[in-house]
Regions:
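A short acidic, often aromatic-flanked loop/helix-cap motif at beta-alpha or helix-coil junctions
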Residues: 30-32, 154-159
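The feature captures the short pre-catalytic strand/loop hairpin that immediately precedes
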Residues: 24, 160-162
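Conserved catalytic-core segment of NTP-binding enzymes
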Residues: 50-61, 66-150, 159
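Short, hydrophobic alpha-helical segments
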Residues: 184-195
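C-terminal boundary of histidine-terminating zinc-finger modules
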Residues: 163-174
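Helical mechanochemical/support elements of P-loop NTPase systems and associated helical scaffolds
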Residues: 36-40, 71, 96-100, 104, ...
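Alpha-helical scaffold segments in soluble metabolic enzymes
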Residues: 43-50, 103, 138, 182, ...
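Nucleotide-state-sensitive switch-loop elements of NTP-binding domains
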Residues: 1-66, 70-71, 83-86
Length: 197
């Protein structure tokens, strides 16, 4: 929305259909050093509702990719305002990533008794650091959840990104694409178990 002089009033101005019919909406945020990124998330969610995004596209599943810095209440807005049913934490075994993942899990726990989104599990996005699997498993156990998927670190992801495409589009027969398909099925199964999709 930052590219617009004024807030866009049409969904088509902030959305784009990508590979495989996936609808992508990039809302951006405030100018660096100015404004509140958490407020940007709130504004984005309100804009999706105002423009009728959910009614127009009737998505099977909605994924929000938000920063892991949940000390700001705005970053927890999708789960607090009923926009999310499950929270999946994507982390590597790097110490700062584990710390951010723990903060997200704590935020979900803090809201547990209010009927907000539940912690659905952890996804390991490998960076090939020492004790990576053990640290991520410990994180899952600390918050009484499970590791629902494990992704290999692959340069193919970066290669596809450099081409402005998804890995599935550039390398559909790769081992990484297979890992993504398996993870997608695991996420759908998690939703089906709770009658969410």
């Amino acid at each position: 929305m930052r590219e617009e002089d004024e807030e866009p009033d049409e969904l088509s101005l902030i959305s784009k259909e990508g590979y495989g019919g996936i609808l992508c909406i990039e809302t951006g945020g405030p100018t660096p050093g100015l404004g509140c990124a958490g407020r940007g998330i709130i504004t984005a969610l309100e804009k999706l509702k105002e423009t009728g995004a959910y009614e127009t596209y009737k998505p099977d599943i909605v994924l929000y990719d938000v920063l892991g810095d949940v000390v700001c209440g705005g970053f927890s807005m999708p789960m607090r305002k009923g926009y999310a049913d499950k929270v999946l934490i994507i982390t590597s075994g790097e110490n700062m990533a584990i710390h951010a993942g723990a903060n997200i899990a704590m935020a979900v726990q803090n809201f547990r008794n209010r009927g907000y989104a539940a912690l659905g599990g952890i996804i390991l996005n490998r960076r090939n650091v020492k004790r990576e699997e053990e640290k991520v498993q410990e994180l899952a156990e600390d918050f009484e959840t499970k590791v629902i998927g494990k992704l290999t670190h692959s340069d193919l992801v970066t290669d596809a990104e450099e081409q402005g495409k998804t890995l599935m589009e550039c390398y559909p027969e790769s081992e990484m694409a297979t890992e993504y398909r398996i993870l997608a099925e695991q996420i759908l199964n998690l939703c089906r178990e709770d009658g969410l999709c």
